Structures are given as C-alpha cells and as structure tokens.
C-alpha cells in the first residue's frame, strides 16, 4: 500500500462504516489511516507519495504530490473516531506543506514536489502527469481545489478555504475559455487538443464542496460553474448505453501518453 489508501478506504471501508456501522469496516479504515500516517516525514512535514517505482532509479522518498490532498480526510476521520490528535496534526502539517510548495500565487498547482527527506528543504518540481514542469495538470487542479476545501471542512482554518478558492478561480477562468471542457493541462501548447473528463468531474465535485463553505453571494458562482462543467462533459463524454458499464468516457491518465 502507498499514499492512495485515502482514496481507497475513505470511499469503501469508511463509507460503509458511516452507513452501516459495520465494526470491521471501522477497523479497516483505522488500519488504513495508520498506514498513511506511517508515511509521514516529521522533518519535512509531508506524507511521502509513491514507494520506489520501477520507472526511475531516483530516490523518491522526498516526493510529494498534489493528489495527496484527497487522502487527508482519512486522517481527519481517524482522529475524530479515536480521539488521537496525531492523525489530524499530520494532515494539517502536510496540507501546510502542499500550500507552501504546491499551490502557486495564481491558483495553479505543481503536481510533484521534491523535498530533501533529511532537511525538508525544497529541491524541485518535476513534470509529473502534466505537460511540463511549470505547467498546470488539470486533474491536479481538482485535487487542490477539492482537497483544500475538505481540509477547511475538518479544521475551519481560513487559509485552506482561501487556497481552495484560488484554485477554483483559476479552474473556472481556464475552463470558461474552452466551453467548460477540461483539457489535460491548462498550460499545454496544444490547449484544445487533449481532454480529460475525469478532471472535469473532480473539479465540479470540488466546486460543489467549496460552495458549502461560503456565503450565499459566493455560492452561486461555484454551483453554477460546476453545473456548466457537468453539462459540457455529459454532452461530449458520457455514454448512456445500458449494455456497457462505463458512463464517463474520455479520461486521460497523463498528458504524455
């Protein structure tokens, strides 16, 4: 297992426990949260991303990715369930690190952040799943927008709400340029060529979450933008054939694929 245990167990074991109060599901969720917490580097205040992958010989023990923001609710939940503040503390410290190195001033994001695992010092921002280093992978934007909104939900810390808004406004501005259809990378030279429906779905979900935490004058912008994205994606990507399992087509793993 690796950093994505939050994606995996929040939507399975934790969700089942919340609905059915199944004790085994609670145990599985807490076990997953403990595994995730075990990936925390206290010096750099980050949760390590991948285990050593086969596609690089470079040491990745200092690699952090924007996707990790979506794993933090598992830690927040575990802290509330157990009363152990260490879970939530790790989540907050990791979110602060992502805020410091992953979210740019204009609301765009870096996919990968490389830190020195011994000192916590910043080293690099590799390309990741986007077009290039310094570009703007759209699904990564979703993870920032949605993830910071969720961190605000659990902590009430305004800096996380502000971070979510920055990412949201960046996404809205870029999506409106292309009829609300999500391209793989908002800064790629082939801006209108490659799409990623999954980025659109995730951005819309993040906008709807964000709308729950703002006043009525702001809420409308996020709600209406989410609906525009969903309608655009439904028109271009959705397959309603009952003979086939998949509904949303047009997903893209990474730009260079």
Give the label of every model feature segment.
Residues 1-257:
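Glycan-recognition and catalytic cores of secretory/periplasmic carbohydrate-active enzymes
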